[in-house]
Regions:
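C-terminal target-recognition/interaction regions appended to catalytic cores
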Residues: 1-137
């Protein structure tokens, strides 16, 4: 929010410092990207975010009102690094981000699976059948 020197960014950040609603990829049945149905948009509003759409740019210096998030901001919320690219079209990019499984969660699951497989191989020997008990230990 502060990248364009928005003078209210610090105050906004204090209000927005809570868990955000789930991002959803949107529907092709209606217009461009928004942050979900009415209940979700109301939850975003409590955080100080206008959920009726996605901004092209962060708020400017003297912006007055409730800001919208950009595609990059939404990607950060979902756990994507800043070097991740989504293409140029805002709606398509938002759908990819909203429908994505968050990368940090995918990484944690992958690491746990690897740990289970390595443990199973050490315990049972290579190629032996795995027990579900290994996963839930």
């Amino acid at each position: 929010m502060a990248s364009n020197c928005w003078e209210s960014a610090t105050l906004w950040a204090e209000k927005a410092n809570k868990i955000a609603p789930t991002l959803v990829g949107g529907s092709k049945k209606h217009g461009g990207p928004d942050l979900g149905p009415v209940r979700a948009r109301n939850a975003w509003l409590i955080l100080g975010v206008d959920g009726r759409g996605v901004a092209n740019e962060p708020p400017l210096l003297e912006f007055n009102g409730v800001p919208r998030l950009t595609v990059r901001m939404l990607a950060r919320l979902q756990g994507f690094s800043d070097d991740w690219t989504f293409g140029l079209r805002k709606t398509a990019a938002y759908r990819m981000i909203g429908n994505a499984f968050p990368p940090p969660v995918a990484k944690a699951i992958g690491e746990k699976l690897k740990e289970c497989l390595l443990y199973a191989e050490e315990s049972n020997g290579p190629g032996e059948r795995l027990s579900q008990e290994i996963i839930w230990r």
